[in-house]
Amino acid sequence: MAKLEAQQKDDLQEKLIAVNRVSKVVKGGRIFSFTALTVVGDGNGKVGYGYGKAREVPAAIQKAMEKARRNMVTVELNAGTLHHPVKGRHTGSRVYMQPASQGTGIIAGGAMRAVLEVAGVHNVLSKAYGSTNPINIVRATVDALVHMKSPSQIAAKRGLNVDEIRG
């Protein structure tokens, strides 16, 4: 019960993406365990994902949530959308995301939608190519978000101010 209260104090949104039963074959038969994939975010640019494995489903989910909280990254957003189109990839999965106008919503499938929701993105157009394995899609999505640069970051890198870059 104490863990539950701590989760509410953090004010983080948590989403369970996938639970999977896996087996290990041993001499005496099969040993079943469960894996869980979760994402956690504050709805304001911080997002993390976690993958947990245990003999019982609740324990796997709890492990995944803890790992997600430990692996959070910060993403700079532009009023609920992205600054520019971005691509991300992880193994066989590739994702493409582009900013969308107000009122568009999150046009994304499954695992990518969950990541974008908890990150605080409200308007985005996206597409997943290649493998749609949830773990790879989540990692590719986070990769794309991390590599997105804000105009202020680009201006600082070039030694200019934001108005000069925007033209």
Swiss-Prot record:
Keyword RNA-binding: yes
Domain-related comment: The N-terminal domain interacts with the head of the 30S subunit; the C-terminal domain interacts with the body and contacts protein S4. The interaction surface between S4 and S5 is involved in control of translational fidelity.
Annotated source species: Shewanella oneidensis (strain ATCC 700550 / JCM 31522 / CIP 106686 / LMG 19005 / NCIMB 14063 / MR-1)
Name this polypeptide is given: Small ribosomal subunit protein uS5
Gene field: rpsE
NCBIfam families xref list: rpsE_bact (TIGR01021)
Domain S5 DRBM: 12-75
Subunit-structure text: Part of the 30S ribosomal subunit. Contacts proteins S4 and S8.
Coiled coil: none
One term under GO cellular component: cytosolic small ribosomal subunit
Keywords: Ribonucleoprotein, Ribosomal protein, RNA-binding, rRNA-binding
GO molecular function, one term: rRNA binding
PANTHER family: MITOCHONDRIAL RIBOSOMAL PROTEIN S5 (PTHR48277:SF1)
Cysteines paired by S-S bonds: none
GO annotation, biological process: translation
Signal peptide: none
Keyword presence, Ribonucleoprotein: yes
